Amino acid sequence: EMGLQKHIVREADMFTQYNPFDFVIGSTHVIDGVDVSQKEFFDGLSKKEAYTKYFESVLENAMLHNCYNVYGHLDYVNRHAPYEDNSVNYEDYRDVIDEILKTLVEKGKGLDVNTSGYRYGAGRPYPQMDILKRFRELGGEIITIGSDAHRPDDIAYRFGDAYEYVKA
């Protein structure tokens, strides 16, 4: 997995050219120097403002970068969000999410279904089903399953459930 940022396009491309990985998951973790998992990212922002900022950054990264095969945990922003209702309602961000998905389809990129949502209380993989279905409606064909494992015990965590989720 490679964290994508708008100011490292050249470096990311060079890194993947000189290190011929079999497969690269691109993702957005840091925006304007602040990690989305940190409280500071959300400080002073409404949920709508924070989530829009996140999705706009994902769109920018998806468009600028070519060094990835699939985009990972597309609705990750809600994992650490401090809001009482931290869910991502696809309809609230439809325009920008659709632009992200269209960009992936046009570039021949895929979407990674990430099972970490089961470990972190979402009760489902990332992205949510509405986003996955919309990706398919827009012509998306490449879907992978990943566990975002940071420990050996989490490798392939709930892949069976994720497989059924993708088939639904």
PLM ranges: what are they?
Residues E1-E106:
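Extended substrate/RNA-proximal surfaces in nucleic-acid metabolism proteins
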Residues D32, E84-A168:
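Charged catalytic cores and adjacent phosphate/nucleic-acid-binding surfaces used
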